[in-house]
Amino acid sequence: MTTTPKSEQDRVIIFDTTLRDGEQCPGATMTFEEKLNVAAMLDEMGVDVIEAGYPFASDGDFEAVHEIAKRSKNSVICGLSRAAHKDIDRCAEAIKPAERGRIHTFLSTSPVHMKYKLQMEAAQVYEMVISSVTRARNHTDDVEWSAEDATRTEFDFLCRCIEAAIKAGATTINLPDTVGYAVPEEYREMFRKVRETVPNADKARFSVHCHDDLGMAVANSIAGVQGGARQIECTINGIGERAGNAALEEVVMAMRVRQDKVPYWNRIESKMLTHASKTVSAATSFPVQYNKAIVGRNAFAHESGIHQDGMIKNAQTYEIMTPETVGVKGTSLVMGKHSGRAGLIHKMEELGYKLSRNQIEDVFVRFKALADRKKDVYDEDIEALVDEQLLHGQDLIRLKSLTVIAGTHGPQRATMKIDVDGQLRIEEAEGNGPVDAVFNCIKALVPHDAKLELYQVHAVTEGTDAQAEVSVRLSHEGRSMTARAADPDTLVASAKAYLGALNKIVAKRQRDVRQDAPAVAVAG
């Protein structure tokens, strides 16, 4: 359990309708096996009621609800049904194997629904409420009745229908904001007034079911609980009709994090929330938006330098819950163009590097340049930058600029500027391909007789903007020297790697002859 219950009166039942309302979202259809997997996960994570489907809709829905009812270990298994007796009977048959089963029947009560959808008078609707709930109660003691479009229903008629449903045997009364029309204060007051007005309101548990058409499904759900409801109907990732439903992960964590304002508890194991999100996303092929609350990729990610600095000092500066609480391994300091020195230093320390102040400054300058060119900077990118600094930070020969002209006609041409121990040199050369042109340019700038033994390229990370890491091995006077370099531009990385190997030859010869290397090794 995620919280210690204060009293049964403060307990909120979590009613998950991912497999019913969630699957009604266009494109979110799940296979039989996927439904079973999702249901097993919901059962394991502590969902009180699983609305497994609408058995009358199809044989496939019936079979899924029936099989889930067989397999459930902890949750109440619920089936949805219209007010028609044949629907209710089919639903009862589907949930029959469940140790604890529920029939959820509904009927529209708003003027617009009664007139245009049902084409019935209020008196007819009232009688059908009694008839349908009575029929359902003949099959099971656990019956939920929903007043579809409750938030647009005339208050007096709504109260009459609720009273009749409870008298007929309904144990849960659901008042949905079917079209996401309500605002929190209005929804809270509706529950408060209904519970005050309906004489037998204390004989049933009240439930919220909110849609997100105005982006207030979660806020309205919490408001309904504050107004006296003790069941929240919701879905994993908030999937559902049109703009979706209240997201289970959000209502659960709102109750956990804001106990001061929302002092209620539930049975959900919050450490499974991220896993649940990924499971449903995979089953429905609906990606979770990056900035989705609680379970989005960026929910515990920080790129801003100011935020990263605060997080390094104390995570509570910018996080109101720990990532581990919802099943995320830890906070992510995302390295990008908004990151500062503190974030970069922290990341380098995480990766096991300890650099001097001057080395850090050099890496930071190159990191900023890389971040401006690359959408995402990964750990591997940071490692490549640091490795290049450690390997080539004291190099005698440094690349200053490179321009390559390439195309389908004529030879490729490279123009390069380098710094040789403080002396700038510039040259251009042609080649059979852009890499050949770059290497010929280096040979013109730094005449040498080293032979190229290896040239190898691979991507440091994924994506078209990934850094290329190039390895070059040169042989000279019986010795082989290998160097590698990384850059988003493969040709720049190639030039840096070649120069890196050349620098190793220079350094080796300098040690061997014990004299000034520039005049001996890079003359010309």
Curated annotation (Swiss-Prot):
Residues 398-524 are annotated as: Regulatory domain. InterPro entries: 2-IPM_HCS-like (IPR050073), 2-isopropylmalate_synth_dimer (IPR013709), AIPM/Hcit_synth_CS (IPR002034), Aldolase_TIM (IPR013785), LeuA/HCS_post-cat (IPR054691), LeuA_allosteric_dom_sf (IPR036230), LeuA_bact_synth (IPR005671), PYR_CT (IPR000891). Pathway: Amino-acid biosynthesis; L-leucine biosynthesis; L-leucine from 3-methyl-2-oxobutanoate: step 1/4. Residues 12-274 form the Pyruvate carboxyltransferase domain. Mn(2+) binds at residues 21, 209, 211, 245. It is found in: Cytoplasm. HAMAP family: LeuA_type1 (MF_01025). Belongs to the alpha-IPM synthase/homocitrate synthase family. LeuA type 1 subfamily. Homodimer. NCBIfam families: leuA_bact (TIGR00973), PRK00915.1-3 (NF002086), PRK00915.1-4 (NF002087). This is 2-isopropylmalate synthase.
